[in-house]
Amino acid sequence: MASTLTTGLPPGPRLPRYLQSVLYLRFREWFLPAMHRKYGDVFSLRVPPYADNLVVYTRPEHIKEIFAADPRSLHAGEGNHILGFVMGEHSVLMTDEAEHARMRSLLMPAFTRAALRGYRDMIASVAREHITRWRPHATINSLDHMNALTLDIILRVVFGVTDPKVKAELTSRLQQIINIHPAILAGVPYPSLKRMNPWKRFFHNQTKIDEILYREIASRRIDSDLTARTDVLSRLLQTKDTPTKPLTDAELRDQLITLLLAGHETTAAALSWTLWELAHAPEIQSQVVWAAVGGDDGFLEAVLKEGMRRHTVIASTARKVTAPAEIGGWRLPAGTVVNTSILLAHASEVSHPKPTEFRPSRFLDGSVAPNTWLPFGGGVRRCLGFGFALTEGAVILQEIFRRFTITAAGPSKGETPLVRNITTVPKHGAHLRLIPQRRLGGLGDSDPP
């Protein structure tokens, strides 16, 4: 192995670094595949402020190396530094080593299988509240509707918010963060920009969100019925961390904002893309209807997983090298950020034959190998909420297709990806026309397809 090891950085484009940043942050859907075709399975980019030296890996064996590496050698918290201005320094996404393990252990009880079973009825109830308001034969912006629905769910699960006024204000302000342009996000680390719009508006909005969160934390700390509540905030307030180190308000705030933002928008985007694919695949949609009525969660989950593969919402994971490291045949210098390209891994013809086809059966026949499907990352940094997201998505699909079938409508017949903040969403909102079922489930006496 030593004879094949190359020291330094892999080849990459010689474009000006800030141009690379724009292409990477805003136009990654075509930029990354172009770089992959030109430079191969491992290549370098310069994309400040995200990373001065970014090494992109696409092959499953290299991705496995990264996910299995000692977390002391690869810091994901440092790799995510651009998110720190929103999520906060104590966020489970921003911390490393012992502090990350501590935060993860505190959050984990809220996402166990037992906890997920407890959330399921609530998810279904909220989904029905929203979907029963949809008008038959109407055309909807599915991205907007999925954002509203998943945010309502996550506010109840994470925050336990039922006050309509608090929900409305928090929803409005969180949407302002969700809709942020990548260029604004890239400018957040520069203090001189804080005095100018749109960054001034961004930080003002964040201050108002913090006021709501801290107010709710203070109120919840003195709640005599805390033990009867099952939301994540109440669980965290009841956690006995250590006698000398209870969770501070700042630590609670950072976990809450992380879960509120990361816990709904990615699922909303994945659902809107999945619905758009189903609108163009009537045979698969017919199977989804039967699965919805019959309670076949396995098939519904496979459909969602294929939607996540076909349309990658989060393009990559990042880890900063703390000391010289050997990954994928390269000895990388300290300070390099290693990037597992979820976007390119999901589009691989080797890992996913006919990758542009929407085929949920991939996830039912055992053909999807480890380290080739990566919406939730991997290793010790795998998303804590992966089980929640899959359960939520399957339940929402079930509630939709018990009542409607769908066709594509308007500009969404030619839907294209758009990078919004750090997520990739349908540019036109994935508009759908709602066709009511003849009765609940829309099924006659014929056998399922």
UniProtKB/Swiss-Prot annotation:
Source domain of life is: Bacteria
Q: What class of enzyme is it?
A: oxidoreductase
Cofactor (UniProt): heme
> What range does the record give for the signal peptide?
none
Q: Which InterPro entries match?
A: Cyt_P450, Cyt_P450_CS, Cyt_P450_E_grp-I, Cyt_P450_sf, Cytochrome_P450_monoxygenase
Pfam families in the cross-refs: p450
User: GO terms for molecular function, please?
Assistant: heme binding; iron ion binding; monooxygenase activity; oxidoreductase activity; oxidoreductase activity, acting on paired donors, with incorporation or reduction of molecular oxygen
Query: A single GO CC term, please?
Result: peptidoglycan-based cell wall
The keyword Repeat is assigned to this record: no
| Entry EC no(s) | 1.14.-.-
- PROSITE patterns reported for this sequence: CYTOCHROME_P450 (PS00086)
Keyword field: Heme, Iron, Metal-binding, Monooxygenase, Oxidoreductase
Q: Which residues bind heme?
A: 383
Family label: Belongs to the cytochrome P450 family.
Family annotation (PANTHER family): CYTOCHROME P450, CYTOCHROME P450 12A4, MITOCHONDRIAL-RELATED
Name it.
Answer: Putative cytochrome P450 135A1
Give the species.
Answer: Mycobacterium tuberculosis (strain ATCC 25618 / H37Rv)
Q: What is the lineage of its organism?
A: Bacteria, Bacillati, Actinomycetota, Actinomycetes, Mycobacteriales
Q: Which gene encodes it?
A: cyp135A1
